[in-house]
From Swiss-Prot:
Gene name, Swiss-Prot/TrEMBL: GCN5
The keyword Nucleus is assigned to this record: yes
Protein name (record): Histone acetyltransferase GCN5
InterPro entries per record: Acyl_CoA_acyltransferase, Bromodomain, Bromodomain-like_sf, Bromodomain_CS, GCN5, GNAT_dom
Annotated PROSITE patterns: BROMODOMAIN_1, BROMODOMAIN_2, GNAT
Ranges annotated as biased composition (Basic and acidic residues): 20-30
Residues forming the catalytic site: 200
GO CC list: histone acetyltransferase complex; nucleus; SAGA complex
Length: 464
């Protein structure tokens, strides 16, 4: 009975589960209607959102097109503005360049040359060149102090006290470049020896911020004209360091000293490591007009050349090479024979001008000449000062002779160059006692030369 009861209960339970799993049709219908109604509403909302989005996109596109048009108009305006600015800049640049050009007529022809900015500034009254010395006047002392400060800054190896002492020394004179009202931008301090007709340039410097305007060259031209006009001085002597040699060469200075040693020896200051240089001034030249004078000389020379030659005639190109690659006889080229050309000249022109070792030898020789110990060997020994020298030394040699031989391409190999260099030192040691300055300088300079040549691998074996 219990088992029957359990089976009945199980059946009832199964039935209830079946009933619960059957869906109510009425309820389902209502839910479907609600779902369908809600679904329609959602679709409408999505369509409205898409339409609004499309309208927004169209508005954005229209706005973007308007912005692009505005940008294009703005770019066009900016481009026009930039072009106008560029044209204005070019016009200003042309005007600035024309300001530096000076022209003059000679023999019916106009000649032009470019002036340095320093010349234009002086012409416009922005700068002036003043000669000052220590006369206790307030303004001159201010200028001398400005010069002293520039020299001390630009010449750091010089003792500051030494510079101050010479600048303020009453036997020295200075020419200063002064920017108005009273700013010193550079200058030269020199000591004239009127009775000996030379002056020693002691200091020469331009402020580091003003070195691209041609002040240095214009200052030297002013100094030359001033000294010639106010004194019998016709020569300048100065000791230049390695950095100043180039500047002084451009101003007409040379390492070749034509003045007799008795004129200047013991009068000028000797600087260790400096190179003595000389400038010989021409009496009939006004150095401030040197550009115009040189251009006039060039014009006169060209005029004389045109009178006896046809080298100024410009001929049209040869038609021979237009359709042909065959060689042409040079003698048939119009104007070539008249110019004096010969086949031998062509052969000479094809030869190499310098030997393969020239650059190396030139560099080593320049280093030797600029060395502090080179002064005894710079020139050949004076026969009048040392009468027995050439009796003892049968094969004399010096650095200036080596320079002449190098320029004449006499050294065919590096061995020949080293031989002459060693000859300089060996001659010195053969003639002088080992306790002398000359003997010691020979050792120092030879040691320096050996070190320099050892730096070049292909020639290092020559000094080992």
């Amino acid at each position: 009975m219990d088992s029957d009861t359990e089976s009945v209960k199980r059946r009832k339970s199964s039935g209830s589960e079946s009933e619960s799993s059957v869906r109510d049709p009425k309820r389902t219908k209502i839910e479907d209607e609600d779902f369908q109604e809600n679904g329609i509403d959602d679709e409408d909302e999505e369509e409205e959102e898409e339409e609004a989005k499309d309208e927004g996109d169209e508005d954005d596109e229209e706005k973007g097109e308007d912005d692009e048009e505005d940008d294009e108009e703005k770019e066009g305006e900016d481009g026009e503005g930039e072009e106008e600015d560029e044209e204005e800049d070019e016009e200003k640049k042309r005007e600035e360049e024309e300001k530096y050009v000076t022209s003059f007529n000679f023999d019916g022809v106009e000649y032009k040359y470019k002036e340095r900015p320093a010349v234009i500034e002086e012409r416009e009254g922005k700068i002036e060149f003043r000669v000052v010395n220590n006369d206790n006047s307030k303004e001159n002392l201010m200028i001398l102090t400005g010069l002293k400060n520039i020299f001390q800054k630009q010449l750091p190896k010089m003792p500051r006290e030494y510079i101050a002492r010479l600048v303020y020394d009453r036997s020295h004179v200075s020419m200063a470049v002064v920017r108005k009202p009273l700013t010193v931008v550079g200058g030269i301090t020199f000591r004239p020896f009127d009775t000996r007709k030379f002056a020693e340039i002691v200091f020469c410097a331009i402020s580091s911020t003003e070195q691209v305007r041609g002040y240095g060259a214009h200052l030297m031209n002013h100094l030359k004209d001033y000294v010639k006009a106010t004194s019998p001085v016709m020569y300048f002597l100065t000791y230049a360091d390695n950095y100043a040699i180039g500047y002084f060469k451009k101003q007409g200075f040379s390492k070749e000293i034509s003045l007799d040693r008795s004129v200047w020896m013991g009068y000028i200051k000797d600087y260790e490591g400096g190179t003595l240089m000389q400038c010989s001034m021409l009496p009939r030249i006004r150095y401030l007009d040197v550009n115009k004078i040189l251009l006039l000389q060039k014009a006169l020379i060209h005029k004389k050349i045109r009178a006896i030659s046809k080298s100024h005639v410009v001929r049209k190109g040869l038609d021979h090479f237009r359709d042909s690659t065959t060689p042409v006889d040079p003698m048939t080229i119009p104007g070539l024979k008249e110019a004096g050309w010969t086949p031998e000249m062509d052969e000479l022109a094809r030869r190499p001008k310098r030997g393969p070792h020239f650059a190396v030898m030139q560099h080593v020789l320049s280093e030797l000449q600029n060395h502090a110990s080179a002064w005894p060997f710079a020139q050949a020994v004076n026969r009048d000062e040392v009468p027995d020298y050439y009796e003892v030394i049968k094969e004399p040699m010096d650095l200036s002779t080596m320079e002449q031989r190098l320029e004449a391409d006499s050294y065919k190999t590096m061995e020949e160059f080293v031989y002459d260099a060693r000859l300089v030192f060996n001659n010195c040691r053969a003639y002088n006692n080992e306790t002398t300055t000359y003997y010691k300088n020979a050792n120092k300079l030879e040691k320096f030369m050996v070190a320099k040549i050892k730096e070049i691998p292909e020639y290092s074996h020559l000094v080992e």
